[in-house]
Amino acid sequence: MSHFKFYSAVVLTANGKKNILLHDIKSPSIEKVNEDIFHVVSSCGSPCVGHYFIGKHEEDYTEELISFDIKSKCIIESDSRKKKIYAKKMFTNNKRILIDLSEKKFNILPSKFNYYSDFSEMSHFDNTGELNLIANDYGKILFKKKIQNPCGSNSK
């Protein structure tokens, strides 16, 4: 039996020029999040997911996306190997540690190899830009914390 696989390329056309940004993306999902930025999601199998944020002149990538706020261009991501949750401004590499998952209180989390999966389902930014960081296991809340302005100032 053959399995249907869908591959495509992401092409940016700006100022009359075509630029292929991503080749052979497997089963992409593309969402326009504002006038200038697209969010492209590509799965390579559980738990492997790639998240690309593509603007007219810049792009950003993360494998462990928890949440993002397009108004402040703030990305919340985890690094499961380093056991950290970071905030960073989109299109920069300046990361700010929000949570150290190696602290004993986080031993309750079920995931040990992909922490983002514990946080990504319920974590969100509210309409004031405050991050509600929530870890859950099948609907049971294991950890909850509100973080104001997780990426720092609103300037880029």
Task: Pin down the residues of each PLM region.
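Repeated scaffold domains used in trafficking and secretory/extracellular systems
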Residues: 22-31, 62-79, 107-123
